[in-house]
Every structure is written in C-alpha cells, then in structure tokens.
C-alpha cells in the first residue's frame, strides 16, 4: 500500500512538472515572422487584449482593439490631469552614455488640458470617419472625453498633460536624455497656424529650446503641411525659424561632408507640392532659391511611394525620411526596401534617414484601420526595425515617435489604466520606461557602428 502511494505521488509530481513546463513554454513563445495584419501568433502575446473606448451611445463595444490580458489589474485609480513621474524612475544623467546626435525623434507639442490651456486639446480627439459611408456607419462617432477617455490606445504616465506645462517639457527632455537621443524633431506650424484639432504652438518653441539645452539636446524642425504651403511661404517660414531661433544653443545644425554646419528641416507630406514648386526654392537656379543664402539648410523630403524618389531629385531636396512606423504600410516604411533606398541616396548624394517605430495602433481615432496595427511584441518589433535601419549604415536614424499618442507610436512612458469603459494597452510585463531603455541600448550600438563606417566614407563624426 505504501509502495502504491509512493508511486502515485511520483506520477502526480511528474504530471505537475509537465504542466508547469508546458505553461512556461507557451509563455515564452514569440512568433518571429508574424507581420502586422497577420493573425498568426497574435493571440499568444500577453500584450494584446480587447480595448473598448467610451464614446457615448453610438459606440459598438464589439468593435474594439486587441489589448493586454494582463491589464485586469484591480483597483487602478483614475490618473490626475498631469501626474509626476516617480523619483525612482529618475536617472543620474552623469552615469548615462553620451548623447547620439545622429539619432532623432519626432516630438509633438500639441496637447492641452484645462489646467494650462482652459480646455483639453488633442486628448479629446474626434473619431475620424471612414471615407466610404457604407463602412463609416459601422463605427462610432463623437469625441473622446478626457481625462479617463483619451484619443489613444495607451495612457501616458504623465496623464492627459499639457504641452505648455514646463514640468512636462522638462520630464520629456529627461526621458530623451535617458534614452541617449540627441535631437528632437519638433512638429511645427507657422505662428497663429495649427492643425485642425489643435491650437498654435510656435510660442512654445522658446521654452522647448531652453529645456532641451538644459539636457544638452538639440532641436530641429518638422514642418507640417499647413494650408497652402508652397515655395514662397516656405522661404518666409524658414527665414522666420532661423532668424528667431537660429542663435539658440539648442538649435540643431548638421555638419555636411564639406564641413558646413546647416540647419535641417524635415518636410512632412512634401509630395503634396509639385516638384516644380520645390525646385524654385531648393535648386540653385530656382526663381526663389534659398541655396547659398543665410537661410540655406538641409531639407528632408518624406518618401511614401517608390515613384517619389525621382520627384525628390527633381525638387532639389537634400535627403529622404520614411516617417511611418508601420512596416509594409508604404514603400518607404517597408524595411525590405531600405537597402535599395540607401543605394539610391548614395548614388545621388542624398541623406537617407530611415524611420523606426515601436509599433502602431490608431484605432482609438480610426477604428476602421485595424489592418495597419503593428503589435509591439514586448519591444521586439522596435528592435527588428532598429536592426534593419542599422544594416543600411545610414547617416541618421529617426524614431517615430516620442509622443504621437493617437497613433500609438510613442516611446514616452505609459502606465496601466482601466476605467469602467476603457482598458488601455501598456508595456507590461516590462516597466513604463521599456522603450527608452531599448532606445538607449540601440543608440549606443548605432553610435559605435556609425563611427566605423563614417570614417570609411569620410562622413562627419561629430
């Protein structure tokens, strides 16, 4: 009888060990080749679970996003309008590796809240309708209702903050510094101009420059497609930027192969303007040429389609960037095309700047756009993109983004949050600073690798 009980105990112990091993194996499983829009493997990831957005009576709760099953945390309290990061998250800057001025990150200063702006700005983003009415009728309408319901699938550690809050700007600069990012590319509209969901932000630039300088960061400008943008008003606006901000110590200049240090301007949606118009501004023979003037610079065009390559050449741009964090969404954002784009840029003496993002999800504002969602895979997607960028040996790398929360491309710290109607994605099982830590790791790697091939190709190394 004792022998039978002993044998039973042994069998039971082996069975428990088998079940435990199986569970651990499933937990560690990560598909290496799952692409976005591909359903295989996504249900295995603890980062994905159902997210619902409260938008009043029009919302259909069956049409929500996949989000992290681990967000069933009990008793999560509502976050205040602007929260202060924990002191434990603050790093000793003296112990960090050097900044990498060849690593840029796109930064947005369009957020507002009642405390600083008298109302919510951008956090209450409307749900955008699909262009096909037959599809649009199947999705919710209305605006988000901050602070608990915001236009994002993630929730910031700082809450529904204002970009005017000096403490928020300072925290952002600290986070960038901790990630060894050297340059922020500031989304910019001309004075008294704004995007359709925002307010003018040019008056924030002096504070952003000052806070950036405190952490030895540099600021370049990401010129948005403001109404009627053309060669004539672009000249005027570039002149304005250089005259007003060009003498600030945080104003970014890139040293070219010839040794000239020139301002850099990313031009979003550059393809909207005809090449002939750009050529007036960006070629030496253009009727409004900015070349060889005090306002000359390096103008970087957004490449979306393959055909844009030759439009960019004709326009007189100095380089290309790809912006979108969605691998496979456009020709330019597809990692598999970066090697040929780099060859094209080398052939025509253009700067190639691949853009890498940690993931993509914009269904809080475009609920019909699930096919373009890109799962973060606990940081793996980000690292795959950074590795693909490094393989092209680029002069610069851009990150999309620091804080474009609407499209879920942010590397800014995010925290778990749930309300009665909304459960947000987060970075668990990792900490809120995961993507800053990954950025720092790859910034160091890029800096070391770039130093070797920069010498081979006689690129500037500082």
Swiss-Prot record:
Region labeled Catalytic — which residues? 60-462
* GO cellular component terms, semicolon-separated: Golgi apparatus; Golgi membrane
Keywords of the record, alphabetical order, are: Golgi apparatus, Hydrolase, Membrane, Signal-anchor, Transmembrane, Transmembrane helix
Tissues/organs with expression: Highly expressed in the liver and kidney. Expressed at lower levels in muscle, pancreas, heart, placenta, lung and brain.
Q: Which reaction does it catalyse?
A: N-{alpha-Glc-(1->3)-alpha-Man-(1->2)-alpha-Man-(1->2)-alpha-Man-(1->3)-[alpha-Man-(1->2)-alpha-Man-(1->3)-[alpha-Man-(1->2)-alpha-Man-(1->6)]-alpha-Man-(1->6)]-beta-Man-(1->4)-beta-GlcNAc-(1->4)-beta-GlcNAc}-L-asparaginyl-[protein] + H2O = alpha-D-glucosyl-(1->3)-D-mannopyranose + N(4)-{alpha-D-Man-(1->2)-alpha-D-Man-(1->3)-[alpha-D-Man-(1->2)-alpha-D-Man-(1->3)-[alpha-D-Man-(1->2)-alpha-D-Man-(1->6)]-alpha-D-Man-(1->6)]-beta-D-Man-(1->4)-beta-D-GlaNAc-(1->4)-beta-D-GlcNAc}-L-asparaginyl-[protein] (N-glucan mannose isomer 8A1,2,3B1,2)
EC number(s) from the headed UniProt entry: 3.2.1.130
Q: Where are the transmembrane segments?
A: 9-29
Name the CDD domains for this protein: GH99 (cd11574)
Tell me how the protein is altered or processed after translation: Undergoes proteolytic cleavage in the C-terminal region.
InterPro entries associated with the record: Glyco_Hydrolase_99 (IPR026071), Glycoside_hydrolase_SF (IPR017853)
Q: Which domain of life is it from?
A: Eukaryota
> Temperature sensitivity?
Optimum temperature is 37 degrees Celsius.
> Which residue ranges does the entry give as Lumenal-facing topology?
30-462
Family of the protein in this entry? Belongs to the glycosyl hydrolase 99 family.
Q: Provide the GO MF annotations for this entry.
A: alpha-mannosidase activity; glycoprotein endo-alpha-1,2-mannosidase activity
Q: Which Pfam families match?
A: Glyco_hydro_99 (PF16317)
Q: Which residues lie on this side of the membrane: Cytoplasmic?
A: 1-8
Membrane topology per record: Single-pass type II membrane protein
Q: What is this protein called?
A: Glycoprotein endo-alpha-1,2-mannosidase
Where is the protein situated, by its record's location annotation? Golgi apparatus membrane
Native species of this protein? Homo sapiens (Human)
The effect of pH on activity is described as: Optimum pH is 6.2.
């Amino acid at each position: 009888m004792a022998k039978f009980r002993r044998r039973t105990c042994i069998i039971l112990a082996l069975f428990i060990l088998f079940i435990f091993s199986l569970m651990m194996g499933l937990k560690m499983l990560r598909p290496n080749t799952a692409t976005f829009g591909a359903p295989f493997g996504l249900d295995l990831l603890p980062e994905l679970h159902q997210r619902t957005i409260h938008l009043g009576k029009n919302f259909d709760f069956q049409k929500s996003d996949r989000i992290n099953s681990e967000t069933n945390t009990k008793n999560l309290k509502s976050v205040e309008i602007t929260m202060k990061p924990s002191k434990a998250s603050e790093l000793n800057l003296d112990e960090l590796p050097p900044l990498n001025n060849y690593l840029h990150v796109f930064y947005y200063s369009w957020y507002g809240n009642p405390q600083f702006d008298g109302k919510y700005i951008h956090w209450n983003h409307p749900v955008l309708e699909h262009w096909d009415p037959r599809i649009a009728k199947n999705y919710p309408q209305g605006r988000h209702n901050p602070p608990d319901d915001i236009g994002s699938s993630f929730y910031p550690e700082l809450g529904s903050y204002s970009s005017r809050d000096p403490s928020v700007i300072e925290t952002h600069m600290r986070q960038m510094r901790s990630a060894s990012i050297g340059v922020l590319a500031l989304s910019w509209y001309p004075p008294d101009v704004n995007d359709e969901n925002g307010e003018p932000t040019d008056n924030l630039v002096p504070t952003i420059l000052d806070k950036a300088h405190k952490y030895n960061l540099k600021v370049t400008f990401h010129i948005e497609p403001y109404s009627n943008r053309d060669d004539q008003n672009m000249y005027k606006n570039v002149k304005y930027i250089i005259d007003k901000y060009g003498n600030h110590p945080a104003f970014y200049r890139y040293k070219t192969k010839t040794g000239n240090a020139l301002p850099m301007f990313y031009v979003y949606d550059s393809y909207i303007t005809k090449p002939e118009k750009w050529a007036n501004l960006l070629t030496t023979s253009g009727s409004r040429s900015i070349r060889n003037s005090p306002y000359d610079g390096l103008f970087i065009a957004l490449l979306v389609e393959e055909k844009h390559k030759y439009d960019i050449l004709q326009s007189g741009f100095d380089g290309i960037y790809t912006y979108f964090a969605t691998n496979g969404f456009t020709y330019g954002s597809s990692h598999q095309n970066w090697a040929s784009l780099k060859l094209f840029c080398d052939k025509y003496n253009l700067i190639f700047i691949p853009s890498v993002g940690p993931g993509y999800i914009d269904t809080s504002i475009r609920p019909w756009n699930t096919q373009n969602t890109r799962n973060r895979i606990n940081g793996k997607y980000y690292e795959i993109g950074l590795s693909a960028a490094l393989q092209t040996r680029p002069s610069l790398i851009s990150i999309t983004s620091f804080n474009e929360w609407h499209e879920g491309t942010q590397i800014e710290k995010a925290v778990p949050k749930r309300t009665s109607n909304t459960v947000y994605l987060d970075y668990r099982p990792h900490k809120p600073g995961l993507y800053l830590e990954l950025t720092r790791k790859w910034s160091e790697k890029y800096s070391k690798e770039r130093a070797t091939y920069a010498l081979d190709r006689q690129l500037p190394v500082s």
